[in-house]
Amino acid sequence: MEIIIISGRSGAGKSVALRALEDIGYYCVDNLTMDLVPQLVDMLENKQHLVAISLDIRNLPQEPETLDHILNLLQEKYPVKIIFLDTDRNTLIRRYSDSRRLHPLSVQNLSLEAAIAAEKEHLEPLVQHANVIIDTTPLSPHELAERLREFLRGNTEKELQIIVESFGFKYGIPLDADYVFDVRFLPNPHWNQELRPMTGLEKPVIEFMQKHIEVDNFIYQTRNYIENWLPMLEKNNRSYLTIAIGCTGGKHRSVYIAQQIGEYFRAKGKKVQIQHKSLEKHTQNK
């Protein structure tokens, strides 16, 4: 029997995630209180092989110790994976404004912003237990469903999936990053008028970066650091490892370096996704 617990910030996509799991054969239960989860699982043990349970802020115990105790009880008897969905504050505010729905904590006479902040604090103990954190800020419902399917495929295959992503610090650090590397100190093609409109995927920018020994040294040392600890991470029952490379705008340096590191591990036979989070913003701004 396999148990998936879906939780996260209200508005981050838990309902979408639960529907996606139902579509691939999971028996899904929405908004069950945490103290009833062990009873439900015991009842379903001989009836269902795949169970997904959605928990929101209203279903969690007030005391972190109670949460720890219940999760430990479950994990002693069953394989349990916890998927936490996160989203940045501004996106949550926009989603609630668009849907005109109330935040679950708004019943406490909190403003939307205060409710979002309070929920983040209350969910922190659960975040510490998560096997994977998915940042749904840039994801459509279809993309979130695909990310979940990838996670579950990786879980079945017991193969660590490495995500190497570039980003711009001006847009914020990715919420799902396990490692963040800051490359803003490296030579910047932005100050070259011919290179400024290009990206780190284009040949002139690549040639510019390759001319600087400090860029090669950074790539070499960073991939060696990751490679050194990768066996331990693979043994730690993880499904995803997200490595975020950031420069100022996420257009030149971080894109080039993320591409180089991702391609290196892909050539080593690792399962790698390379994503350039901020390039879409530059495309939209043209």
From Swiss-Prot:
Protein name in the entry: Nucleotide-binding protein HSM_1595
Similarity comment text for this entry: Belongs to the RapZ-like family.
Species in which this protein is naturally found: Histophilus somni (strain 2336) (Haemophilus somnus)
Alphabetical UniProt keywords: ATP-binding, GTP-binding, Nucleotide-binding
Sample GO molecular function, one term: ATP binding
Amino acids binding ATP: G8, R9, S10, G11, A12, G13, K14, S15
Protein purpose: Displays ATPase and GTPase activities.
Matching Gene3D superfamilies: P-loop containing nucleotide triphosphate hydrolases
Binding site for GTP: D56, I57, R58, N59
Pfam families, sorted: PapZ_C (PF22740), RapZ-like_N (PF03668)
